[in-house]
């Protein structure tokens, strides 16, 4: 590469403009400028010291300028943006008036925000000795005179640069300063120059007025590096706009505004395209002569379903409900009304879907003492539960809880026969592996409440809670981190006579996010923390410390092994003037930093980082005592693992900004930093060698206090294997920044750090040799008082480093420290591409209370192959008196569940780990498929299948592009995926039936893991743009049995021009993928549904049925049955397309009766709610019934009773009493209007319910009866007074004054509750699920009753609650009575279940290859047979670095004519040979004896081998024999000969020693 002479010395008047080619697109390199001398090649740069004024980092680009004599190489490397460049951008002109030569040239841009790139030439006939290329590094203001300076930012396209100087002191000039037009330089003129600078494209926004009505942004195209966006703001307001909303088959709302052209006065049109909605239901209420309010659901038409609610006009009948199960997906209700003259009950048929189980509850009395639920066997999907309510109350009950191997909780109550007075026995059987925990509370002389967990017995763990009987001690909490996923707490109680604090050990999981805190001063009065956004796993928090208060503060930061930062502030007591102390505890493994804040005369808060000692770094935060400067932050990336911040403060008299350098880690490199002190003046980072993504850096911190220099870090990559760091330090008098060059390898290394103590005075890092693993040894001084010396050197710890590599087996190497102390490192290499034919390895590291590190390898049990788990237990700092148990559950690729109990090794006591490996559902022998759906601006749906490249196997990606803003002119496709109990994936395409066009549905059935004994049916309903309802039944294909899918397509409100397609994917228990296309039936056009059934991993014995119901714009119901394809059996899918309909609503309202009374009654859904209006003076009654209500009954609530329950609640009685009573779900609640003076009643009822309520009567009484789905007194599966699993829990309320009772019940229960009685008593009682809850209102003076029922409520009942009772339980609670009573009842299901350990050990080393051979001979009839045994043992190392012992055993019978020997070899290697699994099979080898008997001879058999690849990771080995024995009378005999015998006579036996040459040739 060279720069050619481009101006002759005689061309003094030539002025030309350089134009750059428009195809330059690459990015601008970083670094300093390069000086290029005329005629020099790039390799000459470094050899010429006189030309080395500026660092040589990048080369001049290559392009053809206007003058063809000038050529610059590699122009694309210079430009800073990826866009075509207009030649008009490079027309700036530099004019030089004088004619002297110059050795160097610099230039400064017009402004710091220039946006153009300038290439200039000039009129001078002189030549510049050098051309300087600038890069964006340093911005120079105008008229700056600096030799060899850099230039960043470009000049304006129209700028003219003029150098007009009269100095004659230098010829040729050494420096030329080129400034803007009109400026004059102070140095010698003028050279020939070329200046090339680029900056990114900028965007300019222009706001203009236009006669439209909507503010619009018009985006311009890039021109000359600038994009001009025009924002049109309406300048007139005399018109509005018209919004036209349409539906389309997309997934997002599209808005298009059509502005006025300039002279219209009408409204502007805005088109809004919204996705097709789900079906809209309109309800009409009519009267009929029946006795039950019935909802008749109309067929869908154009997206709307009109439901007719029949309200009884007579009340003299009841009704009979018959509930049955069916295979649909929605609950169907059919009411058979009276014809007009019947007096018997009306029949209501309720069909509920399988596999959901319908439970009917019947309540009967019995002479026992405990409310018991007897669950009947399911019949046709219905379970009849009988609730036995005690009719006598003189006994208690005894609960016996045991575990058994079933899957549901069994409760058996042995009632009294009638005359007993003792307790009734309730037997509760809970399933394994769920563990039942029984808690016993005892007193002990300690100071901390401690839970002692007993050993499990038959599924039950008895926990003993020790409550301190003395209160004179405190406790000390020690929190450490460990690599588990849950928090472990261990309390060491007193033995009985101590008075000191009790120790509580808390082990918390290591965190994943590192938070760095920077402290700055500000003129406020409150310390504030500003949390930054996370970047690369790091969150930078800024703590603003007030500078206007009269005290400071001292922050002491220590590390602990928790996962969150703990901050404790010790405030002043009132008269101190010294600093306040703030204790900050930050989590490990981040280095612990202690921060001290001092004032200094600078302008920026600076953190000076001290050298680390014993895991602690003391940072000094300098807070400015003056506030007149700002600061400039420069952020760069580097290859470390933490964010480094360096602040260059002022020396005391500057007024400009202070510079803060922030170096953030690159995301792909992990860097470990060690800080040591040294006698220099600049903080220096020495990067150690390493590979595999871990690099250790040593930071040299000056031990002197001169910090007046900054530094510039330049990081580049190179092809070496270690990181090289070069620091150009100052010689002593410079004030500019120091340059640090860091060259990092393209592939980094894994570094393991071992910490030991030594007798020096500085913490030193010794880096080991490079390789796959680099071991750094950190020496910590223990003999110098200037450092914090650890009291003990930790021994026996283990550090595990896991890296990926391209092999096929997991390799584990244990690096043991030398000497007797230090960390043991376990390096685990796991394959990056896993072959499913071998065993995967998962390493789980847990902490335990022993003293040694225990490692156990857990292999899968049974016949499974798959993941092997290596459990590493590392000691914690606590010595426990008993054995803890930690359970770790991992997934692996096997087919059976494997459980291994890992006990501590050696003499340690402590934690026992139970490892449970559960099979995953992925079969690794086939290719996974991932589907990615994106939107694009095309008009058709594009599908591309991306298969893995090369020889890889694995995931295939299907990319589906769907149009976004384009009206669909072709067939839309909707994919619905459902699970079913088959074994194969079934796919069916459901197209619209009849003449409908619109959406096509693809139904994909994927297998589940359940084995079905009968045919399941899954119904999938989708909408499409047709006009008729289309139903298709998708049955499993092939020989599969399992789920059948019914696909129902219902019309939407839009008529499409073509056929939409909806895809429904379901699983089933078949073995093949079944695809069926479901078209609409009848004359409808619209959605076609494609049903795809995919097999599951379970083989079902019969065909399941899945029903899919979809809506479409047709007029008929279309049904298609989709069976599985191929030989699969399993799920059959029935696709039903139902039309939508549009209707109107009839909503009658009955007014209130009384004086000034108002009644509002809205009724929605299916309900029976008779209401009596309010009667009285100034009475107001609001009665609203809606599907969602305030006193909502929800299956989820806070004092929730979930599932099926009977809960009777008696309201509060007393003075100024307040009762909160909520009812939710399906209930019977009649309501009687309020009666009285100034009474107000609000009554809202929703869902299907009958809710009678008695209004408030009296003076000053207030009753709030609210039931909501979510509430404050919530019941949750994990709760404060939580009862989980199967339990019997009786609670007696507190007695006192001002009593408060919180009582929540959930799951299937019977919970009668007696209200609170007393003075100022408050009772909160919530009931939810399917219940019968009569409520008696409050009695008092001036009563106001608000009775609200809503789907979501404040006092909600939810399946997750605070005082929650989960599962099946019997919980009787007596309300609070008396004065100041408080009741808290907590039961939890969280337990520790120890398991008897099984000790397993594994050892590393070499495997042994056993080769067995059998010699079979053909015996000559009539001859004597002598058995001869041959044993050959060979030990060696094969080409795969596998040590083995090769043994051959055979038995030979003599005399013989034919000797046949067979060999079978299996080789197991201690390290993986490349990426293949090698085994071998020897072919049979035979040798023939040509005469009989055999005579004496001698010789050696030689064997050769050939290895052949058979295409499936197995090698076939074939061995051949050559040569033989010679001697005796038969010199031509081949085969086996006796080693010694008399000449010419038979032998009784022979001894044969064979030299076997074992040759393995690797491919």
UniProtKB/Swiss-Prot annotation:
Residues bearing carbohydrate: 224, 263, 302, 341, 380, 419, 458, 497, 536, 575, 614, 653, 784, 1510, 1516, 1529, 1532
Region described as 8 X 44 AA approximate tandem repeats: spans on this chain: 826-1140
Family: Belongs to the mam3/map4 family.
Single GO BP term: galactose-specific flocculation
GO molecular function, one term: cell adhesion mediator activity
Entry membrane topology: Lipid-anchor; GPI-anchor
Propeptide: 1540-1563
Signal peptide positions (record): 1-27
Phenotype when the gene is knocked out: Abolishes adhesion and invasive growth.
Residue ranges, annotated region (13 X 22 AA approximate tandem repeats): 1141-1397
Annotated segments matching region 8 X 78 AA approximate tandem repeats: 203-825
Lineage per the UniProt record: Eukaryota, Fungi, Dikarya, Ascomycota, Taphrinomycotina
Protein purpose: Galactose-specific adhesion protein essential for non-sexual flocculation and filamentous growth. Required for adhesion and filamentous growth through recognition of galactose residues on cell surface glycoconjugates. Induces flocculation when overexpressed.
One CC-aspect GO term: external side of plasma membrane
Organism of origin: Schizosaccharomyces pombe (strain 972 / ATCC 24843)
Keywords for the protein's UniProt record, in alphabetical order: Cell membrane, Glycoprotein, GPI-anchor, Lipoprotein, Membrane, Repeat, Signal
Intervals holding Sequence repeats: 203-280, 281-358, 359-436, 437-514, 515-592, 593-670, 671-750, 751-825, 826-869, 870-913, 914-957, 958-1001, 1002-1045, 1046-1089, 1090-1133, 1134-1140, 1141-1162, 1163-1184, 1185-1200, 1201-1221, 1223-1244, 1245-1266, 1267-1282, 1283-1304, 1305-1326, 1327-1348, 1349-1364, 1365-1386, 1387-1397
Residues covered by region (Disordered): 1135-1393
Protein name (Swiss-Prot/TrEMBL): Galactose-specific cell agglutination protein gsf2
Lipidated residue numbers (GPI-anchor amidated serine): 1539
């Amino acid at each position: 590469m060279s720069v050619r002479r481009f101006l002759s010395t005689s061309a003094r008047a030539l002025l030309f403009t350089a134009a750059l080619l428009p195809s330059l697109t690459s990015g601008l390199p970083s670094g300093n400028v390069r000086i290029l001398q005329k005629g020099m090649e790039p390799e000459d740069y470094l050899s010429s010291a006189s030309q080395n004024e500026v660092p040589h980092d990048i080369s001049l680009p290559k392009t053809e300028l206007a003058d063809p004599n000038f050529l610059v190489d590699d122009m694309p490397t210079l430009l800073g943006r990826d866009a075509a460049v207009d030649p008009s951008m490079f027309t700036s002109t530099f004019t030089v008036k004088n004619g002297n030569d110059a050795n160097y040239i610099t230039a400064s841009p017009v402004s710091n925000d220039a946006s153009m790139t300038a290439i200039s030439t000039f009129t001078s006939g002189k030549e510049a000795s050098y051309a300087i290329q600038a890069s964006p590094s340093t911005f120079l203001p105008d008229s700056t005179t600096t030799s060899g300076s850099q230039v960043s930012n470009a000049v304006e396209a129209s700028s003219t640069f003029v150098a007009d100087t009269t100095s004659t002191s230098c010829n040729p000039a050494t420096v030329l300063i080129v400034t803007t037009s009109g400026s004059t330089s102070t140095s010698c003129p003028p050279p020939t120059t070329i200046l090339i600078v680029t900056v990114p494209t900028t965007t300019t926004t222009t706001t203009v007025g236009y006669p439209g009505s909507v503010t619009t942004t018009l985006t311009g195209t890039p021109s000359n590096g600038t994009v001009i966006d025009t924002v049109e703001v309406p300048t007139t307001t005399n018109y509005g706009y018209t919004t036209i909303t349409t539906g389309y088959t997309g997934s997002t709302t599209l808005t298009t505004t059509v502005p006025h052209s300039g002279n219209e006065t009408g409204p502007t049109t805005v088109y809004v395209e919204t996705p097709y909605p789900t079906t809209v239901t309109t309800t009409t209420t009519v009267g009929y002569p029946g006795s039950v309010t019935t909802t008749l659901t109309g067929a869908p038409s154009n997206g709307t379903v009109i439901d007719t609610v029949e309200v009884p006009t007579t009340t003299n009948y009841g009704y009979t409900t018959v509930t049955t199960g069916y295979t649909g997906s929605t609950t169907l209700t059919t009411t058979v009304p009276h014809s007009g003259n019947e007096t018997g009950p009306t029949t209501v048929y309720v069909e509920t879907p399988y596999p959901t189980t319908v439970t009917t509850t019947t309540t009967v009395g019995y002479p026992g003492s405990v409310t018991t639920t007897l669950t009947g066997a399911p019949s046709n999907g219905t379970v009849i539960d009988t609730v036995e309510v005690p009719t006598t109350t003189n006994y208690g009950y005894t609960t016996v809880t045991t575990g058994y191997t079933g899957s549901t909780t069994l409760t058996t109550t042995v009632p009294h026969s009638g005359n007993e007075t003792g307790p009734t026995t309730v037997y509760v059987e809970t399933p394994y592996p769920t563990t039942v925990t029984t808690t016993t509370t005892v007193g002990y002389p300690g100071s901390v409440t401690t839970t002692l967990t007993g050993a499990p017995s038959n599924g039950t763990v008895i926990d003993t809670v020790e409550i301190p009987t003395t209160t004179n001690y405190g406790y000390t909490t020690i929190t450490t981190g460990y690599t588990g996923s849950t928090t472990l707490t261990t309390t060491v109680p007193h033995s009985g006579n101590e008075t000191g604090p009790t120790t509580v050990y808390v082990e918390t999981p290591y965190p994943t996010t590192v938070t760095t805190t920077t402290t700055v001063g500000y003129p406020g009065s409150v310390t504030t923390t500003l949390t930054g956004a996370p970047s690369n796993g790091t969150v930078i928090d800024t703590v603003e410390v007030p500078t206007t208060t009269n005290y400071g503060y001292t922050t002491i930061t220590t590390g602990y092994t928790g996962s969150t930062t703990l901050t404790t502030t010790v405030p002043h007591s009132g008269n101190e003037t010294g600093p306040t102390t703030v204790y900050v505890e930050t989590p490990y493994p981040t280095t612990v930093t202690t921060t001290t804040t001092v004032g200094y005369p600078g302008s920026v808060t600076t953190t000076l980082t001290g050298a680390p000692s014993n895991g602690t770094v003391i940072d000094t935060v300098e807070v400015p005592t003056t506030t007149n400067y700002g600061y400039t932050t420069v952020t760069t990336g580097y290859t470390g693992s933490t964010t480094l911040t360096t602040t260059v403060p002022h020396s005391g008299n500057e007024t400009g900004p202070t510079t803060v350098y922030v170096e953030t880690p690159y995301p792909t490199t992990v860097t470990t930093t060690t800080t040591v002190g040294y006698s220099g003046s600049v903080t220096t980072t020495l990067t150690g060698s390493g590979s595999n993504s871990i690099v250790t850096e040593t930071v040299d911190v000056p031990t002197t206090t001169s910090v007046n220099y900054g530094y510039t870090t330049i990081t580049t990559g190179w092809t070496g294997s270690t990181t090289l760091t070069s620091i150009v330090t100052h010689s002593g008098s410079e004030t500019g920044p120091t340059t640090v060059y860091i060259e990092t390898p393209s592939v980094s290394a894994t570094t393991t750090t071992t910490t030991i103590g030594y007798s020096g005075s500085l913490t030193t890092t010794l880096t080991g040799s490079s390789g796959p693993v680099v071991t750094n040894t950190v020496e910590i001084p223990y003999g110098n008082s200037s450092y914090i010396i650890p009291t003990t050197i930790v021994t026996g710890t283990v550090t595990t480093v896991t890296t990926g590599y391209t092999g096929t087996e997991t390799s584990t190497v244990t690096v043991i420290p030398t000497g007797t102390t230090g960390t043991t490192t376990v390096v685990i290499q796991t394959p990056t591409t896993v072959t499913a034919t071998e065993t995967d390895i998962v390493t789980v590291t847990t902490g335990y209370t022993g003293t040694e590190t225990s490692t156990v390898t857990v292999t899968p049990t049974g016949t499974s192959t798959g993941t092997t788990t290596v459990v590493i237990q590392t000691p914690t700092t606590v010595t426990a008196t008993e054995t803890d148990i930690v359970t770790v559950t991992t997934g692996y690729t096997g087919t059976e569940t494997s459980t291994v109990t890992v006990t501590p090794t050696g003499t340690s006591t402590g934690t026992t780990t139970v490892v449970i490996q559960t099979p995953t559902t992925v079969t690794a022998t086939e290719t996974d498929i991932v589907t990615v759906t994106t939107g694009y601006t095309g008009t058709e749906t594009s599908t591309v299948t991306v298969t893995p490249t090369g020889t890889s196997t694995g995931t295939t990606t299907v990319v589906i592009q769907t149009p976004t803003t384009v009206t669909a002119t072709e067939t839309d496709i909707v994919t619905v995926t459902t699970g079913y109990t088959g074994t194969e994936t079934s796919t069916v395409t459901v197209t619209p039936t009849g003449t409908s066009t619109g959406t096509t549905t693809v139904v994909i059935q994927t297998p589940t893991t359940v084995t079905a004994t009968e045919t399941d049916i899954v119904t999938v309903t989708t909408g499409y743009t047709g006009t008729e309802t289309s139903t298709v039944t998708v049955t499993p294909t092939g020989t599969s049995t399992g789920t059948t899918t019914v696909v129902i397509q219902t019309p939407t409100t839009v008529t499409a021009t073509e056929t939409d397609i909806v895809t429904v994917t379901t699983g089933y228990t078949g073995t093949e993928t079944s695809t069926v296309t479901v078209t609409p039936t009848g004359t409808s056009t619209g959605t076609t549904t494609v049903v795809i059934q995919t097999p599951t991993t379970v083989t079902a014995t019969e065909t399941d049925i899945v029903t899919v119901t979809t809506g479409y714009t047709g007029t008929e119901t279309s049904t298609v049955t989709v069976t599985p394809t191929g030989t699969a059996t399993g799920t059959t899918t029935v696709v039903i397309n139902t039309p939508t309909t549009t209707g109107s609503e009839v909503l009658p309202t009955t007014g209130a009766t009384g004086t000034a009374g108002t009644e509002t009654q809205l009724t929605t859904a299916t309900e029976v709610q008779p209401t009596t209006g309010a009667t009285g003076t100034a009475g107001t009654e609001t009665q609203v019934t809606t599907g969602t209500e305030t006193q909502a009954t929800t299956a989820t609530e806070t004092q929730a009773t979930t599932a099926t329950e009977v809960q009777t609640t008696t309201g509060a009685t007393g003075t100024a009493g307040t009762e909160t009573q909520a009812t939710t779900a399906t209930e019977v609640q009649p309501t009687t209007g309020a009666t009285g003076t100034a009474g107000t009643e609000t009554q809202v009822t929703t869902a299907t319910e009958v809710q009678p309520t008695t209004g408030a009567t009296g003076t000053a009484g207030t009753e709030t009866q609210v039931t909501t789905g979510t509430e404050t007194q919530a019941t949750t599966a994990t709760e404060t007074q939580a009862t989980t699993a199967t339990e019997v829990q009786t609670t007696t309320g507190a007695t006192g004054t001002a009593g408060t009772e919180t009582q929540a019940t959930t799951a299937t229960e019977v919970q009668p509750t007696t209200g609170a009685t007393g003075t100022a008593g408050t009772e909160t009682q919530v009931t939810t699920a399917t219940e019968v809850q009569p409520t008696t209102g409050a009695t008092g003076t001036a009563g106001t009753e608000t009775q609200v029922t809503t789907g979501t409520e404040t006092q909600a009942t939810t399946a997750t609650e605070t005082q929650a009772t989960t599962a099946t339980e019997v919980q009787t609670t007596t309300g609070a009575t008396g004065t100041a009573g408080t009741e808290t009842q907590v039961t939890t299901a969280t337990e520790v279940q120890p398991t008897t350990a099984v000790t397993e050990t594994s050892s590393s080393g070499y495997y042994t290859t056993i080769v067995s051979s059998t010699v079979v001979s053909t015996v000559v009839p009539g001859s004597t047979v002598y058995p001869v045994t041959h044993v050959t043992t060979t030990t060696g190392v094969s080409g795969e670095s596998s040590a083995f012992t090769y043994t051959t055993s055979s038995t030979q019978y003599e005399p013989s004519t034919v000797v046949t020997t067979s060999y079978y070899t299996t080789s197991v290697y201690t390290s993986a040979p490349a990426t293949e699994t090698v085994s071998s099979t020897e072919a049979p080898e035979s040798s023939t004896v040509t005469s009989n008997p055999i005579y004496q001879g001698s010789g050696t058999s030689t064997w050769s081998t050939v290895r052949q690849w058979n295409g499936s990771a197995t090698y076939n080995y074939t061995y051949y024999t050559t040569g033989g024995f010679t001697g005796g009378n038969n010199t031509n005999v081949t085969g086996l000969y006796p080693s010694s015998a008399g000449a010419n006579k038979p032998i009784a036996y022979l001894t044969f020693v064979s030299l076997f040459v074992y040759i393995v040739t690797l491919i």
